[in-house]
Amino acid sequence: MSATLEPLKKSFKAQMLEARELAITASVNRLLSEKGFDAMTVDEVAAEVGIAKASLYKHFNSKEELACAAMVQAIQKAQAYLEDLNAQSAANTEAEVEGELTSVALHKLKASTRWTLQLKLAGQMPTLPSHNSSLRASLMASRPYMDGLMRVSDLLGAWIVQAQKEGFINAALPPITVLYTLYARACDPVVEFLKMSELHSNEEIIEMVMTTCFDGLMVRKNESKLDHHTH
C-alpha cells in the first residue's frame, strides 16, 4: 500500500517571514510610486512596515534590492494580466467595441495601457530612474524580473505587429518605438499633473492620455488600409 506524500507545510516562522516580505514589498511599491527611488529611504520603509531597520536588512541587503523586489512583483502582476488578456478571443482577429469593429490586437494594447494608467492613478505603479547604474545592475541580475519583462515585451510586441499588419497602427513606426511609447505611460508625468490639478476625474484623465497616446500611433484617416498594405 503506497502512502501519498503530503506537501510540506511551511513553519509558522516561515509564514511570518513571507508575510513580512510581502508587507515590505507593498510598502516599497507605494513609496516608489509616490516619491520615486531617489527620494525613498530605507528608514521610511521600515517605519511604515513597523519593523526595525536592522530587521529589514535581514530580508533585503540594500535599497536597490528593495526596489528590485517591488519591480519583480510589478512585472509578474503585469504578465499575469497580459496572459489573461492574451487568452481572451485568441481565435478572433476582430472585436466589437462600442458598436464598432476593431482589431483584437489593438483592443488588447488599449486594455493593457488603460490597466497601467489605472494602477498609476491608484499609486500602485512603481517608477525607477533610468540613470541609476547600481539599480539597473540589480534588475538585470534578477532572473524573475528579466523573464517577466521579456514575456511582457513579447506579448505586447506581437499585438503591435498584428495591429500594424491590419492597418490600425502606423506601420511606418518601428514596433520597438510603439512598445516604448506604451511602456512610457507607466511613468508619464502628465498623469500626475492632471491629477494634481483636481480638474478631472481619474477616468477622464485615463481617456485623455489614451487619446493623446493612441491617436499619435494610429494610421491617419486619409490613409486607407488598402494603401497601407500596398506600400
PLM features: what roles do these ranges have?
Residues 1-35, 39-48, 65:
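Basic, helix-initiating cap at the start of DNA-binding domains
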Residues 1-7, 107, 111, 154, ...:
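C-terminal peripheral helix-coil segments that are non-catalytic and often amphipathic
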Residues 50-60:
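Short hydrophobic/aromatic patch on the recognition helix
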Residues 67-74:
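Alpha-helical DNA-contacting segments of helix-turn-helix folds
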Residues 69, 83-122, 179-182:
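Hydrophobic alpha-helical connector segments
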Residues 110-111, 115-140, 191:
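Amphipathic alpha-helical segments used for helix-helix packing
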